[in-house]
Amino acid sequence: MAVTIDYSLCKGAECAECVNNCPMEVFEIEGDKVVVARPDDCTYCGVCEDVCPTGAVKVEPE
């Protein structure tokens, strides 16, 4: 499994719902962009995907 961000849809730091809601703190803001900073800590719970208002964050098979 992998967490991916579609940057054409992601609103980055102005939204940051994934950053603020991830129970494992997998995401970080770098500049105005959200990045998957700690992918090995991800438990693939899907919270990030559920809270993303634009559908930019996906939890998918690799």
Curated annotation (Swiss-Prot):
The yes or no answer to whether the keyword Ribonucleoprotein is present is no
From the UniProt record, which GO molecular function terms apply?
A: 4 iron, 4 sulfur cluster binding; metal ion binding; oxidoreductase activity
Query: Where is coiled-coil annotated?
Result: none
Q: Where is the 4Fe-4S ferredoxin-type domain?
A: 2-31, 32-62
Report residues binding [4Fe-4S] cluster 1: C10, C15, C18, C22
Q: Which UniProt keywords apply?
A: 4Fe-4S, Electron transport, Iron, Iron-sulfur, Metal-binding, Repeat, Transport
| Protein name as catalogued | Uncharacterized ferredoxin MJ0199
Question: Cross-referenced Gene3D superfamilies, in alphabetical order?
Answer: 3.30.70.20
Needed co-factor(s): [4Fe-4S] cluster
Q: Which InterPro entries match?
A: 4Fe4S_Fe-S-bd (IPR017896), 4Fe4S_Fe_S_CS (IPR017900), Fe-S_Ferredoxin (IPR050572)
List, alphabetically, the Pfam families matched. Fer4_7 (PF12838)
The organism that produces this protein has a lineage beginning with: Archaea, Methanobacteriati, Methanobacteriota, Methanomada group, Methanococci
Co-factor: note: Binds 2 [4Fe-4S] clusters.
- The entry marks the following residues as binding [4Fe-4S] cluster 2, namely C42, C45, C48, C52
